[in-house]
């Protein structure tokens, strides 16, 4: 017998799970809950979320309430009579009245090994912290943030060059498999959630654009990780003089033979350009830029940018 599901999600990372459940012979996705259309692009035209577009393409009814915890929407969801509701990066906290609607509760797929990195940016936080292992967790939603009992986990190695986008792409796929098996176990009454440990709790709030600004006073390994952690969103950036420049991942290797000796004392934010590389000083060793994106332009090779911009020899990144 098919389990009636309402799927709640918004960004592209939720698509593997949504598609997996739609195509499953054991589940019936009766409706999709997503955030309202949001402004996108230079013109700021409202656009449907990636999850909304997938639901529309599949002919699945869309629910896009501005206030999902309002009594009006709680009543509307009740009329759909879901047996279980599923959340993958929906983008809003759910209150007790809404959580009480489905008899089998709400199941969340979260992209960390809970209780580590509760919150909106677990993948970014894991990379920035220098973690080598992360994963995805399915758990029963409670009113408090990402604290509910756990159904299952899957682990994933963080590669030394992983950006948040790279890692999230893999977790979205492995997490979709975990979520499907979790729902099967709940339906078969063979899966019992276990409480999260009280130790090891950490939090990963959403990263703002201002927080993605590079602090060159930090040691090179920290700078390198933080840039990867905010790539592609919201994107690392710095000021070069008064010009704002977005940065792609940088390279750091304190033992690299191509690092000129004169760069060793390069001050934090100091810029050195030669015929094949652009280096910026940090609180320890310099890092080499790969790609940069000046305001209003596309990403380009850092050397081409530096030569085209005709940087002042005293120019600094800040």
UniProtKB/Swiss-Prot annotation:
Gene3D superfamilies: 3.40.50.12230. It comes from the Bacteria. It is an enzyme of class 2 (transferase). GO terms for molecular function: methionyl-tRNA formyltransferase activity. Keywords: Protein biosynthesis, Transferase. CDD domains: FMT_core_Met-tRNA-FMT_N, Met_tRNA_FMT_C. (6S)-5,6,7,8-tetrahydrofolate binds at residues 112-115. Its EC number is 2.1.2.9. One of its GO terms (cellular component) is cytosol. It catalyses: L-methionyl-tRNA(fMet) + (6R)-10-formyltetrahydrofolate = N-formyl-L-methionyl-tRNA(fMet) + (6S)-5,6,7,8-tetrahydrofolate + H(+). Pfam families: Formyl_trans_C, Formyl_trans_N. Belongs to the Fmt family. Attaches a formyl group to the free amino group of methionyl-tRNA(fMet). The formyl group appears to play a dual role in the initiator identity of N-formylmethionyl-tRNA by promoting its recognition by IF2 and preventing the misappropriation of this tRNA by the elongation apparatus. This is Methionyl-tRNA formyltransferase. It comes from Mycobacterium leprae (strain TN). The gene is fmt.
